[in-house]
Amino acid sequence: MYDRAPRFTQLTLSSTTSEIGPGTYNINRSLGGDRGSYAPFLSLSIRDSGFLGSASALHSPGPGQYNSDITRNHVLGGNSLQNRSKRFDDVLSDVPGPGAYNVTNDVSPARKIKAKSPKITSKAVRPSLSPAAPSIPSPGQAFGYEEDAQGVLHKHKVPSRDHSLGPAFYSPAPEELWSSQKYKGVQFGKMSGRREPLKGADEPGPGHYELQEDQTVQYENVNVKREQRSRSELSIPRYHELVPLQEEKKGVPGPGQYYIKSQFETSSNTHRPAQSPPFLSQAQRFSPVKDETPPVGAYNDPRCALEILKKGRALNKNPFGQTAVRFLPENRSKATPGPGAYNMFGYGLAQESLKKASLQSSRKAAFGSVAQRRIFLPSKEEMSTPGPTQYKVEKTNEALYKKQSTAAFKSASDRLVVSLFAKDTPPPGSYNVSQSFEKTQCLHQYSKPRNENARKRQSCFLSAASRNTDVLHNDPHTPGPAYYSPDVKSSSTLALIISKEDRFKDPKDEVPGPTAYELSPVIMDTVLKGTFNVTLHNPLMSSTRSLSSHRSWRKPTAHSSA
């Protein structure tokens, strides 16, 4: 680390150093001397050139031997647009156009055969049918006629028509440029080829041998090093150095925190009389806008007394040896009353006046003064002076319109109704909320009837059926009650609609209950079953004996009657 030997920062890429080159060789000595061996560098091994990566690179093709069409067709990166066919092909109709028909001039061979067959010609002279131009020419006769020297009309032939397709029917494939087929994105992300590193031979080359050591002395300027040391460098403290610096900075007070006493300050008089509150009131003039109601959980609930046991009992380090609370919260649970701790009847006019009277009696001074008030004893001169009510003030004549009373000032009723005091209203527990809610919001329950006649009549008014049903329509053809015969009973057709019986009745369980069974009189009053133990008194045996004796007593009567 502290060695002064030169460091080689740049290494040569080839197998030779920069000391070997043109001008460094001694040609005369090499030509004149005898060669001891024809092998270069005393070695007959094959040396690979450093410019060729491997021997296989010699057999690789040159730059003009590649087929560029393959690379043009294979566009890297354009995977989403592989289909080059047209989305909408040109619609070509298969129906021939108006000039696509070819009308032949020769007569069909069937007509020629008919013409050659011998026919019976009539002796009557037929007029010669000379072709004439038709009034409405067909498409084959629309090119005109030419009159011969003999006056025979010859039809013009149809001109030769070019049947090749026009320019609208061609669809040549446009030759796409190679620049338009290239992928415009990043290409190096998809390359998989690697560049072979250029490695030289492992054998040492000429010039790598140091036959003579370099013993030159290197000089260093000490003054230059001192100038470099004096330069200011950025010093960033580490974490273990930064922590004590921050802790030392906390104990130093900031600017403006010093309080220097001045010699011109007014000394505070501690013996002056205490100032009483103005207007004999100690109430706060301007109450804060902030709501003073305690938040949720601020009450001292005795149910939370076991939470103290959850806290740790380890002794905390008290600052300055004090255990008092330094910062008291604004809303303390002790100062705020809990739910149900308010006294509604204690805050009234009588309580406030009693509080003011006791407060004024305890104070000695009035109007904020502590000086002793002397007793007022008037002298003779002061007694002779008239008082405030002994003067006679002359009454001025008022206008007549001021003496007349109007309706606004003549009425003795209050214009603004004063709200009732809180003490006149009943407390919140005096109302029966449950009964009032059931009568107003729930179903109305009628009072019970007082006698039996009222109980019979009550069923008429408690019916939920409509009195005037919409089912019975007024029909003039329907007979009235006087048209019916009392002997014939007519069955009403609307019985299914007017009937109030339930369509779907509740299923009744037809299984007999526990009281439906009848026990025999023998086992009715006992739970004991038959036993073979003679020592126990078995009531069954006595009952069976009585029954057998009763039967034997009735049998001879039957024989005697017979």
Swiss-Prot record:
Signal peptide interval: none
Biased composition (Basic and acidic residues): 193-202
Annotated spans, Disordered: 114-136, 192-215, 543-562
KW Nucleotidyltransferase (keyword) present: no
Keyword Protease among record annotations: no
Matches recorded under PANTHER family: SHIPPO-1-RELATED
Protein name: Sperm-tail PG-rich repeat-containing protein 2
Organism of origin: Danio rerio (Zebrafish)
